[in-house]
Amino acid sequence: MTQPEVSPIHQLFDSRNAEYRHPFGAVEEGCTVLFRILLPRWLGCRGAYLIRCPDGGDEALDGMFWAGQMDDSYEWWDCRYTPEKAGLVWYGFQLETGQGRRYLVRQPDATAALSASPGPLWQLTCYEQGFRTPDWLAGGVMY
């Protein structure tokens, strides 16, 4: 059976769009981040999970909640995650669907593609509470 295409008008996830991830950019430890994904209803999603992989740590799954329909064809799922310590957290999404386990994997433009296997993850940078950029670096670019 051929599966319908995902509409190019509807992004499944976009890490650079506050509708899908808020706040945008690096966050302070203890700051809660909202993650939202938009799934086509034909997928028959029964469960969605945020996959978290702290740098050097073990993978964890956080259950996402069904958050309503966008229209007759798409539905929102969301969850909140609060990083407890500074560092990098790699993340992605795992789906339990009518067609089996599926994943949302990162594309070069930071949006998501539906995949039958795990793939590239997104990165969340978490900095120490109270960290302040030195005045001499403000507005600069560091390589």
Can you name each region flagged by the protein language model?
Residues 33-42:
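Short edge beta-strand/loop segments characteristic of extracellular beta-sandwich folds
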Residues 1-34, 54-143:
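The feature marks proteins involved in alpha-glucan
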Residues 43-50:
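Solvent-exposed loop/turn segments flanking beta-strands in beta-repeat/beta-sandwich domains
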